[in-house]
C-alpha cells in the first residue's frame, strides 16, 4: 500500500545526504546555514524547504544537534578545559558556548561533564 504522505524526490534526498556529508566535515568551523547552502549551490530558503520536507526539521536544528554532539564528545572523552573546547569548535568565547549548550540541552557544560565522569 502506498503511503498517503508524499515521498521526497530523489534530488531532495541527495541534497540532504550531501548536506550531512558537509556537516560532518565542516561543523567544527561553520554553524551557519548559508555556508552549507552555498557549498551545495542552493539558496538557504531552498535548503530549509528540502530539509523540512525530507527530515521534518530545519538545517539549523540539525547543525545545532551536530554541534551539541561534538561538545558532548569533547566533554566525555577529553579533559580539555571548556575554553579550549570553545576554541576547537570556533566559538567566539567559552561563555557563549556555555549559553549555547545550556539553551539546547537544558544542562550546563560543567554539570554534563560531571555527570559523565560519574558514569
For the regions a protein language model found, what residue spans apply to each?
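Basic, amphipathic alpha-helical hairpins
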Residues: 1-5, 19-32, 50-51, 55, ...
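Inter-domain helical "communication" segments and dimerization helices
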Residues: 1-46, 59, 114-119
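Core residues of bacterial helix-turn-helix
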Residues: 40, 89-90, 101
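Residue-level detector of short coil/turn "hinge" positions at structural boundaries
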Residues: 44, 82, 93, 108-109
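Short hydrophobic/aromatic patch on the recognition helix
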Residues: 47, 96-97, 101
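Terminal helix-turn-helix DNA-binding modules in bacterial transcription factors
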Residues: 54-95, 114-119
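…primarily DNA-binding HTH/wHTH and HhH modules…
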Residues: 99-119
Amino acid at each position: 500500500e502506498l503511503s498517503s504522505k508524499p515521498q521526497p524526490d530523489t534530488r531532495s534526498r541527495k541534497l540532504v545526504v550531501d548536506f550531512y556529508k558537509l556537516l560532518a566535515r565542516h561543523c567544527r568551523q561553520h554553524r551557519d546555514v548559508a555556508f552549507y547552502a552555498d557549498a551545495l549551490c542552493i539558496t538557504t530558503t531552498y535548503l530549509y524547504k528540502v530539509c523540512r520536507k525530507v527530515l521534518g526539521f530545519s538545517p539549523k536544528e540539525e547543525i545545532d544537534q551536530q554541534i551539541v554532539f561534538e561538545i558532548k564528545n569533547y566533554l566525555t572523552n577529553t579533559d580539555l578545559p571548556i575554553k579550549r573546547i570553545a576554541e576547537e569548535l570556533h566559538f567566539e568565547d567559552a561563555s557563549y558556548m556555555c549559553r549555547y549548550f545550556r539553551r539546547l540541552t537544558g544542562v550546563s557544560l560543567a554539570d554534563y561533564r560531571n555527570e559523565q565522569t560519574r558514569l
